[in-house]
Amino acid sequence: MNNSNNIFQQKRILLAVVISFLFFVIYDYFFIPKQPLKIEQNITQKNQQNTSINNTPNIQNATTNTPSAALVSQDSVISKVQSKHFEAQIDSFGRISAFYLKDRKYQNEKGEFINLVSKENSPYPLEMRFSDPSINSEAFKIPYVANASNLFVDENGSQVLKLTQNLSGLKIEKDITFYPKGNYEIEVKLSKNANYFISPGYRPNIAVDSYTVHGALVMDNKETIETYKDGDVEKDESANNVVMTSAFDRYYATFFYNFDKPLNVAISKDANQNPIVFAYSDNEFKAGGYIGSKEHVILRSIDPRLEAVVEYGWFTFIAKPMFEFLNFLHQYIGNWGWAIVVMTLIVRIILFPLTYKSMISMNKLKDLAPKMKDIRERYKGDPQKMNMHMMELYKKHGANPMSGCLPILLQIPIFFAIYRVLLNAIELKAAPWAFWIHDLSVMDPYFILPILMGATMFLQQLITPMTIQDPMQAKIMKFLPVIFTFFFITFPAGLTLYWFVNNLCSLVQQWVINKIFAKEHHKKTSGA
C-alpha cells in the first residue's frame, strides 16, 4: 500500500539507481558516438546536397584517383621538418604524411613516438584534391619538389618549406611556415584558377574509445560551433565564414584556422558516416594549421579559441572552471594526482553545509522509524490519514525525507563536469600519482583503486542511517557498491581516484555526524 514515507524512500532509491545506471549506460548511448567496425579510407561518392553555399564545387570528382595510404612508402618522403617538440614528414604528394610529438607521454608500449597522421585513413594533412578529374589524376602522379630536404625550427624561430608541383598547364605552389610547437601557416597559389579541396587531415585516430567524443567541428565568425560526431554524418554539407575547423579524437586534433579571413569548408563523410573536413578554393588559400595534442597551454598560446576543441559536453560551464582550478592546484603541487585529491577535498568542503543538513535529516528519520512504523500499522486502511499523520510527525521533529536528495542532485552536474575534465585532459596522460599509479589517464593495472572505492562505498552504507522498509530496495542499495566497482574497473585512474577520495570524505563526514547526533540524542534522553 502506498504511503508518503514509502514514496519518499522510493524516490531516493530510484534517484541513486538512476544516477548510476543512466550515467554508465544511457549517457554513453546518447552522448558517445558508436564506433565503426571498420575504418574506410575513401570519401563518399555522394553529390553535395542541401548545402549552405550554392557555389560549392563538387567534391565527387575530387575523391577519385587518389592514392592508397599503403602506396606511400618511406622513399616518397621528400622533406623532414623538426623542432625540439615535433617531427613532420612531407611526402611527394605535398602532404604531411607523418607527424610525431617528441615527448615521453606520446610514446607507445614499444617506446616509439606515435604517428598522429592515421595511415589507415585519407586524407592526409595538406592533401589537395581537384574537382577536375584530369587535374586530380595528374596531381597524384607528378611529385612535388621541395626547396629543402631537412629543416630544423629553433625554439623562438620558424622555417619555411616551399613545395612546387608542375602539371600540364598548371603550377601549384605551397609555402608552409612551421613553428616550434607544431603549428604552421599554409599558403597555396595556383598559376590559374582551378577548384580544389585541401584538408587539415583526418582525425589522428590514436585515442579513440567509447568514453569520449571524436569527429570534427566547425566554428563560424560568430563563434557558433557545429560538431560532427563519428557515425552521425548523414549527408555532405558546407559552411562559409568559418574561422576554425578541426578533426579530433580524445587527446589529439588537427586544425585549419583563419580568424582574419574566414574559410569556406565542406564536410563530407566516409563509408562509416565519419566526418571528413576540407577547405576549398579556386586559387589562393591561406590558413593557420596545427597538428598535436589538445593541451590547453599549447592551444591557448596559439589562439585561445582553439580550446573549443576540448569537449566537455552539457556541463562545459562548470567543467572549464574545474579544469582551470585543477590546473592552478597542479602549478603549486606539481603532481596531477595530488591536485585531484586536493580539488576533491575542497569541493567536499564547499558542499559540506548541504551534506550536513542531509545527513542530520537522515539521522532524524532513523530515530523516527518506530513512530513511522506505528502510524503505518494504525492507519494501514486509511492512506489519507496515514499521510496526514506522517507529515505532522515530520513537521514536529524537523525531519524532511526529501532533503537527502538535494545534495545528490546538486552534485550531479559537478560529477559530470569532473568526469569530463578527467577523461579528456591530455595533461593527465603519462602523469603519475603515487605508489603503483604511473599514468592517471589509463585504468588501474591492479584494480586497487576501484576495489578501494567500492569498499568505501560499502562502509559508508553500513554507517549511514537507513529507514528503508522494503527488502527489495535494501538489496538494490547493497548492490550499488558492486555495480560501481564493476564499472570503474576500466575507468581512468584519475577519475577513480577522484571518486575514491570523494567516498572517503563522505565516510568521514558521516562518521563525525553520527557521533555528533549520538551526543545530542544522549543529552536529550538524559535531560528527559
UniProtKB/Swiss-Prot annotation:
Q: Where in the cell is it found?
A: Cell inner membrane
Q: Does this entry carry the keyword Iron? A: no
Q: Which is one Pfam family of this protein? A: YidC_periplas
Which Gene Ontology terms describe the biological processes this protein takes part in? protein insertion into membrane; protein transport
InterPro entries the UniProt entry points to: Membr_insert_YidC, Membr_insert_YidC_N, YidC/ALB3/OXA1/COX18, YidC/Oxa/ALB_C, YidC_ALB_C, YidC_periplasmic_sf
Q: What Gene Ontology molecular-function terms does this entry list?
A: membrane insertase activity
Membrane protein topology class: Multi-pass membrane protein
Q: Name the cystine pairs.
A: none
Predominant place of localization? membrane
Keyword annotations for this protein, in alphabetical order, are:
Cell inner membrane, Cell membrane, Chaperone, Membrane, Protein transport, Transmembrane, Transmembrane helix, Transport
User: What GO CC annotations are associated with the protein?
Assistant: plasma membrane
Q: Tell me where the transmembrane regions lie.
A: 13-33, 336-356, 406-426, 446-466, 481-501
Its annotated function is as follows:
Required for the insertion and/or proper folding and/or complex formation of integral membrane proteins into the membrane. Involved in integration of membrane proteins that insert both dependently and independently of the Sec translocase complex, as well as at least some lipoproteins. Aids folding of multispanning membrane proteins.
Record's HAMAP family?
YidC_type1
Q: How does it assemble?
A: Interacts with the Sec translocase complex via SecD. Specifically interacts with transmembrane segments of nascent integral membrane proteins during membrane integration.
The entry assigns this protein to a family as follows:
Belongs to the OXA1/ALB3/YidC family. Type 1 subfamily.
Name it.
Membrane protein insertase YidC
What species is given as this protein's source? Campylobacter jejuni subsp. jejuni serotype O:2 (strain ATCC 700819 / NCTC 11168)
